[in-house]
Amino acid sequence: MADPSLNDNPTACPHCASSQAGLLCVCPAGKSPVLVVEMSQTSSIGSTEFFASQERKKERNTSRESSLKDLSIRTSNVERKPQAQWSRSNVTVGKIPHIRMDDGAGIEEFYTFGRILGQGSFGMVFEAIDKETGAKWAIKKVNKEKAGSSAMKLLEREVSILKTVNHQHIIHLEQVFESPQKMYLVMELCEDGELKAVMDQRGHFSENETRLIIQSLASAIAYLHNKDIVHRDLKLENIMVKSSFIDDNNEMNLNIKVTDFGLSVQKHGSRSEGMMQTTCGTPIYMAPEVINAHDYSQQCDIWSIGVIMFILLCGEPPFLANSEEKLYELIKKGELRFENPVWESVSDSAKNTLKQLMKVDPAHRITAKELLDNQWLTGNTLSSARPTNVLEMMKEWKNNPESDEETNTDEETEQSAVYSPSANTAKQPTNAAKKPAAESVGMTSSNSSSSKLLSAESKAEPEKSSETVGHASVAKTTLKSTTLFRGKKRL
């Protein structure tokens, strides 16, 4: 419930109602300056709208201080209309504060800036410490003027998507501070840096180490795809390592986080199957359909996962060329080569998984959900590798139909044994010979071999009940009909 003592208009000064959104009001009524701020949807903190007012903080009653204790300590001059209990330690889905300021100095009231973690053409990333809790965060500081309108659109898109997601392997956005000149994103700190930097130090990862990384990555991408979000720029540089340790087998275990959602898009069903057409991303990670500028779907992310997995295993990308045009030609052909000596120690199961991830035709490519059940990824490499994509299963049968026919023959033999009547079978009443129409149709549709077999059985067992024979015929006819149907498809 909103505080009745506060003005209902979140973009106006509660004393004189003359301020503009995002500006500091110097109230003509002689009251303390008030900064108008607003809350954005979905994250870990919780609320919708609040005002900044030093005077109102002093006037809070005891019950309000009790219910919003953490907030009152955090925001010496910030007040809000409460809708839910606010807690800094709560990391479940709630609300992300998007705080409007008159200048960038306001954020320093909450955080102490430390070392520079990264630097770009129009921004920097700092390590920062929460003054209240001592927790470490990464703060991305962006100069709006230098960034320009196009870059700001990408940043706003990233913020919008990060406000809607909550996954253990996706970077967490804690708060947003914004002034007319700058924007600050307070994000989860990944102290081990980019996955690419870690890999460059090691050369490549072992198969088990790669498996753990791809498991985490597949989980994050399956989550995004389930929410109709396509990343479109998956690469080693956009995967951060929050922490790592060496296990008892001397294998490195990495806790990864997918980041950089500037090129991401959330489908809303405006196009058939949520198809996209914009060519974007990093060339060596681009899927063939993206390069061709054809309609493409979330399956472009799956190709990128394949490229990442390939690089993790051998230390180099699957396709290399001295020009972008030649690189694109290699990608569109999609011919994977395992020529590096390191591939000799990689299992066939891992190589088969790569082939499923990097099918040129996205319709034949494994999905993120299917990848989570992949035999290599789950560690179940004892059973024979079979495709999980429906189209790939059909293609395999078309190329090798004999295997299915052999299976059907074995099943038919088993069924014949099961339904074969015993010599001691008692004779059933004659009225039991009247069978349903469905069984009659099944018997007449059986092929000649089935008829001969039934005839032989009838001669060998003259006292066999017609009901028993009927059931045997139906069971065997079903199996044989399946084989005949497949034979017709091959013709």
UniProtKB/Swiss-Prot annotation:
It is found in: Cytoplasm; Cytoplasm, Cytoskeleton; Cytoplasm, Perinuclear region. Its main location: cytoplasm. Its EC number is 2.7.11.1. The modification Phosphoserine is found at residue 403. SUPFAM superfamilies: Protein kinase-like (PK-like). Residues 51-89, 398-491 are annotated as: Disordered. Residues 111-377 form the Protein kinase domain. InterPro entries: Kinase-like_dom_sf (IPR011009), Prot_kinase_dom (IPR000719), Protein_kinase_ATP_BS (IPR017441), Ser/Thr_kinase_AS (IPR008271). Residues 445-457 have a biased composition (Low complexity). ATP binds at residues 117-125, 140. Residues 54-82 have a biased composition (Basic and acidic residues). It is an enzyme of class 2 (transferase). Belongs to the protein kinase superfamily. CAMK Ser/Thr protein kinase family. CaMK subfamily. Serine/threonine protein kinase required for spermatid differentiation and male fertility. Promotes sperm flagella assembly during spermatogenesis by mediating phosphorylation of fibrous sheath proteins AKAP3 and AKAP4. Also phosphorylates vimentin/VIM, thereby regulating the dynamic behavior of the intermediate filament cytoskeleton. This is Serine/threonine-protein kinase 33.
